[in-house]
């Protein structure tokens, strides 16, 4: 399974850009395989993301903002959920990964 991070490459929001970067840096630092899905360029990907976020996790107003995180086709959460899991040291559970990726011996 691959972690998919739905993001907006051309967002004018500094906050969104920082949040996207934080998620990607965490995944890279922990050697977690991931795929970036740019919803600004592909309408079908944006619509897929909207349809696959559980109704109880949608914002009360407007559309869900990036980054949105999936494990393959299973919704994990948004940035706030990711941040909370990072703070409570439960990111691997949040990402629905069995364990940390194996570290290579140097």
Curated annotation (Swiss-Prot):
Per the UniProt record, one Pfam family is SH3BGR
Asked whether the UniProt record includes Disulfide bond among its keywords, one would answer no
Q: Which UniProt keywords apply?
A: Nucleus, SH3-binding
Entries under Gene3D superfamilies matching the protein? Glutaredoxin
Locations listed in the record: Nucleus
Entry GO terms, CC: nucleus
State if Signal is listed as a keyword. Answer: no
Q: InterPro entries, from UniProt? A: Glut_rich_SH3-bd, SH3BGR, Thioredoxin-like_sf
Q: Where is the motif (SH3-binding)? A: 61-67
MF annotations from Gene Ontology: SH3 domain binding
Q: Which family does it belong to?
A: Belongs to the SH3BGR family.
Q: Which PANTHER family match?
A: SH3 DOMAIN-BINDING GLUTAMIC ACID-RICH-LIKE PROTEIN (PTHR12232), SH3 DOMAIN-BINDING GLUTAMIC ACID-RICH-LIKE PROTEIN 2 (PTHR12232:SF4)
Put simply, this protein is called SH3 domain-binding glutamic acid-rich-like protein 2
Per the UniProt entry, what species is this protein from, by scientific name? Xenopus tropicalis
């Amino acid at each position: 399974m691959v972690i998919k991070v739905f993001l907006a490459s051309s967002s004018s929001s500094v906050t969104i850009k920082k949040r996207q970067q934080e998620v990607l840096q965490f995944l890279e630092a922990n050697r977690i395989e991931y795929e970036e899905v740019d919803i600004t360029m592909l309408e079908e990907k944006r619509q897929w993301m909207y349809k696959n976020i559980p109704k109880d996790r949608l914002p009360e107003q407007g559309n869900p903002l990036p980054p949105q995180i999936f494990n393959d086709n299973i919704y994990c959460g948004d940035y706030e959920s990711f941040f909370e899991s990072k703070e409570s040291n439960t990111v691997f559970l949040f990402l629905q990964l069995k364990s940390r990726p194996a570290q290579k011996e140097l």
